[in-house]
Amino acid sequence: MTLTDYVREVSLADFGKPFKHQASWNRRLRTTGGRFFPKDGHLDFNPKILEEHGETVFRQIVRHELCHYHLYFEGLGFRHKDQAFKELLDQVDGLRYAPRLQSHQANYLYICQHCGQAYDRKRPINLAVFACGRCHGRLIEKNQS
C-alpha cells in the first residue's frame, strides 16, 4: 500500500471524506510530523516519525494533516489557532504536536557555572561570546560520553 492510499484510507475511515490529492515522504522534515500545502493540496510526511514512534502515532499525525486539508477545502479555519481546527482535531483524536525524535544527537553539552542550566548543541559555540540565557552566567563545556 502506498502512502497516498494509506492517507485515503484514513480520510475515509476517520473523516468520512475522500482525500483527492497526493501524499509523499519528505526526509528533510526535522521538527514536524507532516505538512499541508494549500496551493496544490498535497501532504508531506516525516518517515522518521513512523520508524521511531510506530503506526499509532503516525496515524494521529495523518489525522492532524487531514484536519488542515479538509477544513481548507471546506472554507473553514484550517490554521492551528482556529477554533474549527481545534474542535475537529479533538473529534478525530489527532496529535496537536509531533513527538520529539530520538535521532537528534547532541555533540556538545554546555553547563552554566552559576545556575546549572544545561544546553545541548550539535555545533560548538564560542564560550568567550555566549553566556547563559537564564542568568547570564559563564558557560563551561562538559564532555559527552
Curated annotation (Swiss-Prot):
Alphabetized GO MF terms: zinc ion binding
Active site positions: E65
Disulphides: none
InterPro entries, sorted: SprT-like_domain (IPR006640), Uncharacterised_SprT-like (IPR023524)
Domain SprT-like: 5-140
Cellular component annotations (GO), alphabetically ordered: cytoplasm
Co-factor remark: Binds 1 zinc ion.
Residues involved in Zn(2+) binding: H64, H68
Cofactor: Zn(2+)
Main location: cytoplasm
Subcellular locations according to the entry: Cytoplasm
Pfam families tied to this protein: SprT-like
Keywords: Cytoplasm, Metal-binding, Zinc
Protein's GO biological process: response to stress
Similarity comment: family membership: Belongs to the SprT family.
NCBIfam families noted in UniProt: PRK04351.1
Protein name as it appears in the record: Protein SprT-like
Lineage of the organism: Bacteria, Bacillati, Bacillota, Bacilli, Lactobacillales
